[in-house]
């Protein structure tokens, strides 16, 4: 039996099924860094460590050992089916007869990263910027369509010491289509625990990322709340009509509507000058989830339409 086992981004994310498969395996094969990360749970096993870049030889060896009657585990970080060993193994076994294979899913880097960043995922696309196996022209096309489709974009292999052009192209396309204020979450897993940063696209620099980084690019509705990225999925967040709105309508129907800033309002000033307190009669107020640029003022217990990009303008 050949077991393709995803160990997730760290030992603490291994599934119970994967742990049992490791325990049942006679031989463990994998990239040295991944093997070392689970060394304490594979003690007593025959372990074969390989270097980066010899994935084909690693796969052939695992198949050969399994055909000899061994129960073999080949290790993949994250999930084996997401830029992992599963694809390669299934290409290789076409040359052989009677190779029994089972895949054990793992927590993918994109899911792990998204959870650290908050709740940024909605409809999303996953793109690797590595052009070792994929032409740059194809990567460019995928980036353009994902950006135009307003997908959240999870980016694997964003950059390396010798491979910078795909990242530069990626950033240029996103700036042109999405704009400089687009939120980007960076999860750097080069060390443990992983480090997270959230920046605007215009602030995303080459020196801030590496080959172990996973990027989560927000869409047009993604916003920042309490340091977390959030992409609303369309849930209706119901809010009672605020007393300030009721007060406005009472004055409106009595012909006593204030013009300009309402200096008598106990909440004034709660937003930028020039909006003339129009949040009080906005038919969508309070919009409730922050996706339009508004924000909740905790100390005043009121919703501010400052920076709202949906209905209001600063003109």
Predicted regions, residues:
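Short beta-strand segments
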Residues: 5-6, 74-77, 127-130, 155-156, ...
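Class I S-adenosyl-L-methionine
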Residues: 1-101
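Cysteine-centered metal-binding/redox modules
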Residues: 243-315
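Class I SAM-dependent methyltransferase SAM-binding "motif I" and its flanking Rossmann-like core
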Residues: 10, 82-149
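Short gly/ser/thr-rich secondary-structure transition/capping motifs
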Residues: 7-13, 134-136, 197-199
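Generic beta-sheet signal
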Residues: 1-5, 70-76, 124, 149-155, ...
